[in-house]
Amino acid sequence: YYCDGKWSDAIDYSTKSTDSFSVMYVGDPQIGASVGQDSNTKEYHAMNDAYNWQGTLNSALSAHTDISFILSAGDQINQTKVTKEEDKLEQQIEYAGFLYPSQLRSTPIATTIGNHDSKSVNYQNHFNTPNAAVKAENTEGATTAGTDYYFRYGNTLFVSIDTNNYNCATHENVIKEAVENNKDAKWRVLMFHQDIYGSGYDHSDTDGMVLRTQLTPIIDNYDFDAVLQGHDHTYSRTYQISTDGKDHTDYTKAPSTSATDDFNAYLNDNICYNLESNADNAHKVIDPEGTVYFEANSATGSKYYQLIGTQQDYIAARSQSWRPTYSVIDITDVTLTVRTYDAATNEELVADGGIATAYTIVKQADKTSLVSAIEEAQKKLDEAKKSGLYTDASIAEAQALIDAAQTIADNAEATTKDVASAAAGLADVESKLVKIDNGNKDDDKNDDVKDDDKDVVAGYAKEGTGMAIWFTLAGVAFIGLTAVLVSDRKRKQQ
């Protein structure tokens, strides 16, 4: 880069695989949010939070060197108001702190708009958002900061929506466009800031719930596998959630106090979901219905919230460790796994009650053709066994091929490549069969040569090459005679 009359050092960047890849997921870096914890200036706290942010990135990217890019679920900065010039300056200082870490010069980052980002154009001045909404129906209600966007990486569609915009019809229009343009994406991941299924004290029972009734059916209808949230500065993961299929059109912001009948009615009205899975300590689901929702704690520790007093029925795991955390999402052809780590130790976070935070969704590869091929191969092998024409060793070798293919068919996490390879291997089953050569069995059912004749031929072969020489000489003589006849015919034609 050329800046202030000088060239910077060269920055190395290498692209990562798009077949199987890893993504880092963080919540609320919120540079500058530690302000108010002591008497230092805003600039001091922005510097302090930026230092911790760099520490998290350094720790995570050193431990997980295969990270393709970073996803940040909103609130990159803390300064919300921009009514004064000093407010605008403070925002710029905080954005400078957010973008300061050297790791961000070689690792892409995709952000979403948090409530602290939403009231200033400074957000969109700092981030390039691919496929950003421009149509009127895709931008209705957009905030000053920008609007929704999406991108494709490998087999996964990533969609980011600005939930500071409560016009969910706008979000549905963008989601519809993204899905229609990426129909072959194996995985769909949605990211937004407000946690509609979180467990933090400050938001999960207020503004997050307002959006819940409207977004849940959209998310369910477009078959998103995972939703990444921020906002509440706690960790949580839900069970698999789907919509209840009912209309929830009457919704308002939560009452100001929880000690009222109105609030209890509000809570009941916001039960707009079904739990598709609620098994305790279930860390892997195979071909599940519904969507899993994650809530990320602060990646910098600039601010934390308490967990809500009573754990909601949709929450499978939650934690407030009061330490910066980050998550890594590993995506393959058939699995999507999310693991959450302590940023200081890189050890996997353990949620309340000793619940592990690792969670895997398995989408099995299509094995229809493989299963049919196994059945056909086994049928042919069984017939070969009954015929008694083939050696035990070759039958065992063919059976081993079928058994190996069956192992792939039984493995929920077998990849599409594994399945194709197993199916191809079955094509060799018949070629593995070797006929018994004991002078008593036909080498070929369609061969009319009698066994006695075969013995004679075998005898010639054993005695030496005399017959072979005789056949060769006879062949030469025949070829010579043919040549003479052809030559004579040509002369007559002339």
Regions found by a protein language model. Give the residues of each.
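Active-site-proximal beta-strand elements of phosphoester/diester hydrolases
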Residues: 21-42, 155-165, 189-193, 292-298, ...
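Extracellular Ser/Thr-rich, low-complexity/disordered mucin-like segments
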Residues: 450-471
